[in-house]
């Protein structure tokens, strides 16, 4: 009887642990949001607003930008530090890269978590941006982007040059809250 009680106790403990893990997973990615207001840096006129919404394993990113070079592409990244105080936004640090991967194409699995698709501006230097990515979370955890910064670069990211895609100066920066 004692052996059977022990087996039942172990089984119930395992079920309880699995339930806790399942509940934690369900809490994550169920609509948590963060946003950033980007201000001009490096003498540019660029600015924007970005919203991050966690949906399951993915994060939906929506943004609006102005003051960009007309009919062009700009690199766009989440950076490791939540600090945009430097005039050239170098205070934001490098690309957010919690898994120490090489720089690369977004969603390839072989990229920094902070590597985002380029922004494409219209003839007036405005852009509307939408992307759905994975590899990071909308929280303050080790893979979380809350408390970090998001940066627009002057030039397009080539997704191959190391360590940062050869995307030029940082022209706008905002803290992700």
Predicted regions and their residues:
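N-terminal leader/targeting pre-sequences
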Residues: 2, 16-73, 78-177
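Bacterial N-terminal signal peptides that target proteins for export
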Residues: 2-12
């Amino acid at each position: 009887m004692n052996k059977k009680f022990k087996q039942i106790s172990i089984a119930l403990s395992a079920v309880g642990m699995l339930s806790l893990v399942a509940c934690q997973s369900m809490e994550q990615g169920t609509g948590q949001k963060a946003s950033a207001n980007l201000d001009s840096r490096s003498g540019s006129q660029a600015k924007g607003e970005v919203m991050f919404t966690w949906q399951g394993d993915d994060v939906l990113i929506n943004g609006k930008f102005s003051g960009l070079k007309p009919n062009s592409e700009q690199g766009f990244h989440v950076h490791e530090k939540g600090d945009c105080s430097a005039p050239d936004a170098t205070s934001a640090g490098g690309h957010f890269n919690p898994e120490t991967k090489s720089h690369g194409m977004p969603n390839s699995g072989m990229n920094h978590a902070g590597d985002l698709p380029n922004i494409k501006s219209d003839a007036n230097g405005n852009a509307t941006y939408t992307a759905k990515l994975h590899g990071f979370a909308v929280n303050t955890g080790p893979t979380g982007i809350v408390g970090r910064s998001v940066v627009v670069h002057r030039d397009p990211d080539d997704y191959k040059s190391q360590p940062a895609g050869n995307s030029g100066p940082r022209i706008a920066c905002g803290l992700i809250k």
